[in-house]
Amino acid sequence: MARKGLIQREKKRQKLEQKYHLIRRSSKKEISKVQSLNDKWEIYRKLQSPPRNSAPTRLHRRCFATGRPRANYRDFGLSGHILREMVHACLLPGARRSSW
């Protein structure tokens, strides 16, 4: 189980990313439209004004059940460890166990 503080930090980053998403997107569109280098630099400065944690690259997928940051399956939102346990317990419809 991940520490509670790390999970809360990730939730805070998600909220910040949603809050500043439109500002970042509009600034990036402006950069592609503007031709002059000085205007581009002004827009780049404007793009750097939101907090760092609002950047989408700072987000990290975590397991829905445990908060584990590694080995996550996007389709389920679970880490491989928990996914395997749930499949063996028949809690995920449509998932098949592998046996070899």
From Swiss-Prot:
NCBIfam families the record matches: PRK08881.1
Swiss-Prot/TrEMBL GO biological process terms: translation
Assembly mode: Part of the 30S ribosomal subunit.
UniProt keyword rRNA-binding, yes or no: yes
Main location: plastid
Alphabetized GO MF terms: rRNA binding; structural constituent of ribosome
Name of this chain's protein: Small ribosomal subunit protein uS14c
Keyword match Ribonucleoprotein: yes
InterPro entries, A to Z: Ribosomal_uS14, Ribosomal_uS14_bac/plastid, Ribosomal_uS14_CS
Residues in the signal sequence: none
Alphabetical keyword list: Chloroplast, Plastid, Ribonucleoprotein, Ribosomal protein, RNA-binding, rRNA-binding
Family according to the record: Belongs to the universal ribosomal protein uS14 family.
Function: Binds 16S rRNA, required for the assembly of 30S particles.
Species in which this protein is naturally found: Coffea arabica (Arabian coffee)
Coiled coil feature spans: none
Gene Ontology CC, one term: small ribosomal subunit
